[in-house]
């Protein structure tokens, strides 16, 4: 499942609406990437959304 391990952003659910206001179910998925970070001095791999990645909420391992 696409879920950010930093902010817990996950798939959200709702409806698509046509011009006639017919409702069909749809999902919105977060833009999640798998990166390596430094956690307590050791590198580990996490799934993080691009919003958290851009705002430097984690230290990226190079």
Swiss-Prot record:
GO molecular function, one term: structural constituent of ribosome
Keywords: Ribonucleoprotein, Ribosomal protein
Record-level GO BP terms: translation
Annotated Gene Ontology cellular component terms: ribonucleoprotein complex; ribosome
Similarity comment: family membership: Belongs to the bacterial ribosomal protein bL28 family.
Protein name in UniProt: Large ribosomal subunit protein bL28
